[in-house]
Amino acid sequence: MKTLGEFIVEKQHEFSHATGELTALLSAIKLGAKIIHRDINKAGLVDILGASGAENVQGEVQQKLDLFANEKLKAALKARDIVAGIASEEEDEIVVFEGCEHAKYVVLMDPLDGSSNIDVNVSVGTIFSIYRRVTPVGTPVTEEDFLQPGNKQVAAGYVVYGSSTMLVYTTGCGVHAFTYDPSLGVFCLCQERMRFPEKGKTYSINEGNYIKFPNGVKKYIKFCQEEDKSTNRPYTSRYIGSLVADFHRNLLKGGIYLYPSTASHPDGKLRLLYECNPMAFLAEQAGGKASDGKERILDIIPETLHQRRSFFVGNDHMVEDVERFIREFPDA
């Protein structure tokens, strides 16, 4: 049985130029995930369920666990002295770590994706993304360090808190998964070099918003529901409402996750930096594809910290089908 720490160090030795800083950074994220796991499991016994009464920069009501997870991850990253700053879905602006100007990395994160599901005991997750800073080492980081396209990511991953807690990550050399053993306090390797199955058979979308979707997406949903044995249709509809949980299931079983634009969110709802980019990096490393319906997610140059985007991610052939329908059936 190989632990996450052992696996990361083993992979580090494959790179002659490795300094160990990225290894230490991933270790900090691992620690934060353990703390969040512990408190999610007793969320109903302590006062961290429900809304906090505050709103984030997007005007969304923050859950108490959102804020808790944000603070724990931020503290774990700052304590290691290897991160120059962070950007978080729960922070209005970037957070510059004083005294860490020498650090080479910045971290972007969604501390608790799907947190509204906590009250009903549904799986939630943590998403993280790591970049090398572009401003000179030795100076405080600026927004420029965070507004990089996804193809510049050094590492990305997520933690899914479900029937078991699992950490999945990539450094650009495949996707690897580790299950948390609470009796030992360690993440243990359970799947190495994960890949999407050759053919997907599940589509994940909130069909309650069907009337608000673009024409191309409506046509694709009907395509998924039609019977065609040659393409293994109709597909199965599965939607949890937590990006991490839906993506993880589709990675294992094969499928596509869709979050298109609507009239109320014409640019889409998911955040490019905190959700789309890291999941797109993971998807491509697992043989899948991620798109906003027109272009590759990882090639989009971000303009603002909390920029939103339409998001389609999963098996490559399924994402390509969505893109085709969007091209062929544009909105009037």
From Swiss-Prot:
Spell out the coiled coil positions from the record: none
Which gene codes for it? fbp
Could you tell me what the cofactor note in this record states?
A: Binds 2 magnesium ions per subunit.
Q: Which residues bind Mg(2+) 2?
A: 110, 113, 275
Any idea what this protein is called?
Answer: Fructose-1,6-bisphosphatase class 1
Q: Where along the chain is substrate bound?
A: 113-116, 206, 239, 257-259, 269
What this protein needs as a cofactor is:
Mg(2+)
Q: Which organism is it from?
A: Escherichia coli (strain K12)
Residues binding Mg(2+) 1: 89, 110, 112
UniProt binding sites for AMP: 19-23, 104-105
Q: Which CDD domains match?
A: FBPase
In which pathway does this enzyme or protein participate?
Carbohydrate biosynthesis; gluconeogenesis
Give one GO term, molecular function aspect: nucleotide binding
Write out the similarity annotation: Belongs to the FBPase class 1 family.
Q: Which reaction does it catalyse?
A: beta-D-fructose 1,6-bisphosphate + H2O = beta-D-fructose 6-phosphate + phosphate
Extract the InterPro entries matched here. FBPase_C_dom, FBPase_class-1, FBPase_N, FBPtase, Fructose_bisphosphatase_AS
Give the principal location in a single coarse category: cytoplasm
Which keywords label this protein? Allosteric enzyme, Carbohydrate metabolism, Cytoplasm, Hydrolase, Magnesium, Metal-binding, Nucleotide-binding
Which Pfam families does the record associate with it? FBPase (PF00316), FBPase_C (PF18913)
Q: Which residues bind phosphoenolpyruvate?
A: 3-5, 30
Summarize the activity regulation: Subject to complex allosteric regulation. The enzyme can assume an active R-state, or an inactive T-state. Intermediate conformations may exist. Activated by three-carbon carboxylic acids, phosphorylated three-carbon carboxylic acids and sulfate. Strongly activated by phosphoenolpyruvate and citrate. Inhibited by AMP, which affects the turnover of bound substrate and not the affinity for substrate. Allosterically inhibited by glucose 6-phosphate. AMP and glucose 6-phosphate act synergistically as allosteric inhibitors. Phosphoenolpyruvate antagonizes inhibition by AMP and glucose 6-phosphate.
